Amino acid sequence: MTQRSQIATSFLPLPGSAPVEWRIEPGLTAYPDALAFMEARAEAIRSGGAGEMVWLVEHPPLYTAGTSARIEDLIEPDRFPVFSAGRGGEYTYHGPGQRVAYVMLDLKRRREDVRAFVAALEQWIIGTLAAFNVRGERREDRVGVWVVRPDRPRLPDGSPAEDKIAAIGIRLRRWVSFHGIAINVEPELTHFGGIVPCGVQDHGVTSLVDLGLPVGMADLDLALKSAFEDVFGPVAALPAEVARKTG
């Protein structure tokens, strides 16, 4: 099987397609509200009643369980609310200081290839991190984007320590995607301690600020947009983004 690192990651739409709507939500978004919005929007995209969309949000502290989540990986079930997400993957944490990008795209207009779509999402994240001179890397045995930590002791097997900086969890229904990615800007990293993030015990989590970078959410959002257009094509910003930048 072809490794994800060898898959072509261009997911440009068919010629003549409308730009992807790009919306930045102010404040904290309740997770049930986000689920309801994504379900409705994905159905509207499938039926032709709405266009593709990327929705950037922050959530209050919570854990979500993907379809592969194991109950033993929920270490502190009473620490934060726990939601069944319906996406792929295992447990993850969302909270303030973490940018969640919900990606609602019609892959019939792009490429009907799930593995290539995951690789494209990883490339989007890697391109975003590169704007801050952070080398994000993919791993064939685990989804997400990782950074090597030469400042940390090596693992027992002698391999370099590495931390996860971004998670990916998606769902496709009749080739329309929803759910998406999460990048750690400045979340409270101790909040990840209530779970085994994504079922991976041997590696930790990090953030842009933890890596020593003075990056804010607005900085990340600009980099996200530029890197998204490289992989997925043009976007059209909604008024919410303008309000966020000037508010």
UniProtKB/Swiss-Prot annotation:
Pathway: Protein modification; protein lipoylation via endogenous pathway; protein N(6)-(lipoyl)lysine from octanoyl-[acyl-carrier-protein]: step 1/2. InterPro entries: aa-tRNA-synth_II/BPL/LPL, BPL_LPL_catalytic, Octanoyltransferase, Octanoyltransferase_CS. It is found in: Cytoplasm. Coiled coil: none annotated. PROSITE patterns: BPL_LPL_CATALYTIC, LIPB. Residues 48-236 form the BPL/LPL catalytic domain. It comes from the Bacteria. One of its GO terms (molecular function) is lipoyl(octanoyl) transferase activity. The keyword Transmembrane does not apply. Its main location: cytoplasm. The keyword Transferase applies. Belongs to the LipB family. In the reaction, the free carboxyl group of octanoic acid is attached via an amide linkage to the epsilon-amino group of a specific lysine residue of lipoyl domains of lipoate-dependent enzymes. HAMAP family: LipB. Catalyzes the transfer of endogenously produced octanoic acid from octanoyl-acyl-carrier-protein onto the lipoyl domains of lipoate-dependent enzymes. Lipoyl-ACP can also act as a substrate although octanoyl-ACP is likely to be the physiological substrate. This is Octanoyltransferase. It comes from Mesorhizobium japonicum (strain LMG 29417 / CECT 9101 / MAFF 303099). The gene is lipB.
